């Protein structure tokens, strides 16, 4: 039986204890992260999460041990996501907040041949600080719309040179570095996170917050409207349901002419409007003074509510009238000439 170093046993035990002590356990890839950015990340996570870098094999053993001791076999599914330079990130933060924190903590990094870009790389349109040289030919060979303008290299339009997930070539790395474009990111890449028996992967955690909030708002409004329409009372909808019921009952009472303190004004208002409608078609000598006053007031309200022509429209109308008058005069002159 092979001898296992004591420090490895101790490391596995410590890792397992960390895993058992936190509700959320994540795996992050620290491979390729320089010492200084990693140190800054530790500082940022202090008080929020515990980062423990170790060997992949020891992390795997620790996960198995913790899963067995906790009685949570689902935890072992994390092992499938161990890759690169894995490290354990233990926290009480929910996986979605943790993923957002890690993504926001990443900083841009220069292009490096052989590296995979995390997102589309676009060379923006506009002038650059590059002087004419062989690089222009290399750009054009790759389809980049570059040309010389005023002694400098200028990009004619936005051009996508790499799609997310593609690899940077040596030639493209040289061009991007010359242009000062940093397509890479330095930070901790979350590989997977475990909470309450569920393993979350980055594609699940990478949500569009604004879109998600919009979806929740729409769902809330649909549920609210449905609750009101079927008269299902809740704390949120009871007021709207009562208002709807009140207005419905009031409208029925008004239509039926049933007088109450809430309907009397509407009923008499309808009656007066009906009387005035009839009065408009009667001879004026049959109307009393009060009815005439009401008809005049109604007419004034209608005039006040009608849209007034603007000064420009009035001027245009006057110009049109002048043109019409001129054309009429021309026509009369023409007739006069015709008949001598």
UniProtKB/Swiss-Prot annotation:
**Pfam family membership, one:** RL10P_insert
Q: Which InterPro entries has this protein been placed in?
A: Ribosomal_protein_uL10 (IPR050323), Ribosomal_uL10 (IPR001790), Ribosomal_uL10-like_insert (IPR040637), Ribosomal_uL10-like_insert_sf (IPR043164), Ribosomal_uL10-like_sf (IPR043141), Ribosomal_uL10_arc (IPR022909)
Q: List UniProt keywords, sorted A-Z.
A: Ribonucleoprotein, Ribosomal protein, RNA-binding, rRNA-binding
Tell me if Ribonucleoprotein is a UniProt keyword of this record: yes
* Gene Ontology terms: cellular component: cytosolic large ribosomal subunit
Record flagged with keyword Kinase: no
Ranges of biased composition (kind: Acidic residues): 313-331
Q: What biological process terms from GO does the record include?
A: cytoplasmic translation
Chain segments annotated as coiled-coil in the UniProt record: none
Annotated GO molecular function terms are: large ribosomal subunit rRNA binding; structural constituent of ribosome
Positions of the UniProt region annotated as Disordered: 304-340
UniProt similarity note: Belongs to the universal ribosomal protein uL10 family.
Cite the record's note on assembly: Part of the 50S ribosomal subunit. Forms part of the ribosomal stalk which helps the ribosome interact with GTP-bound translation factors. Forms a heptameric L10(L12)2(L12)2(L12)2 complex, where L10 forms an elongated spine to which the L12 dimers bind in a sequential fashion.
Record function comment: Forms part of the ribosomal stalk, playing a central role in the interaction of the ribosome with GTP-bound translation factors.
| Protein name, UniProt field | Large ribosomal subunit protein uL10
């Amino acid at each position: 039986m092979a001898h296992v170093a004591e420090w490895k046993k101790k490391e596995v035990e410590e890792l397992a204890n960390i895993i058992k002590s936190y509700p959320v356990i994540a795996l992050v890839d620290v491979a390729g992260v320089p010492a200084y950015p990693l140190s800054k990340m530790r500082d940022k996570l202090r008080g929020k999460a515990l980062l423990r870098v170790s060997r992949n094999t020891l992390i795997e053993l620790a996960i198995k041990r913790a899963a067995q001791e906790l009685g949570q076999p689902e935890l072992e599914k994390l092992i499938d996501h161990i890759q690169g330079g894995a490290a354990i990130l233990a926290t009480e933060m929910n996986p979605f907040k943790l993923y957002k924190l890690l993504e926001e903590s990443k900083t841009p990094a220069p292009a490096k041949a052989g590296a995979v870009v995390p997102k589309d790389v676009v060379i923006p349109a506009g002038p650059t600080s590059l002087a004419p040289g062989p690089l222009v030919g290399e750009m054009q060979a790759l389809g980049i719309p570059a040309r010389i303008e005023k002694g400098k290299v200028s990009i004619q339009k936005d051009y996508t040179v790499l799609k997310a997930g593609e690899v940077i070539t040596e030639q493209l790395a040289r061009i991007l570095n010359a242009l000062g474009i940093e397509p890479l990111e330095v930070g901790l890449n979350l590989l997977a996170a475990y909470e309450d028996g569920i393993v979350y992967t980055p594609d699940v955690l990478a949500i569009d917050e604004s879109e998600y909030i919009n979806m929740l708002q729409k769902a809330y409004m649909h549920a609210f409207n449905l609750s009101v329409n079927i008269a299902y009372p809740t704390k949120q909808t009871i007021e709207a349901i009562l208002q709807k019921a009140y207005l419905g009952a009031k409208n029925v009472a008004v239509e039926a002419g049933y007088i109450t303190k809430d309907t009397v004004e509407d009923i008499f208002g309808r009656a007066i409007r009906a009387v005035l409608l009839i009065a408009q078609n009667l001879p004026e000598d049959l109307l009393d003074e009060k009815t005439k006053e009401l008809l005049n007031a109604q007419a004034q309200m209608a005039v006040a509510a009608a849209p007034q022509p603007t000064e420009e429209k009035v001027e245009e109308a006057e110009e049109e009238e002048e043109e019409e008058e001129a054309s009429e005069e021309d026509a009369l002159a023409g007739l006069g000439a015709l008949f001598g």
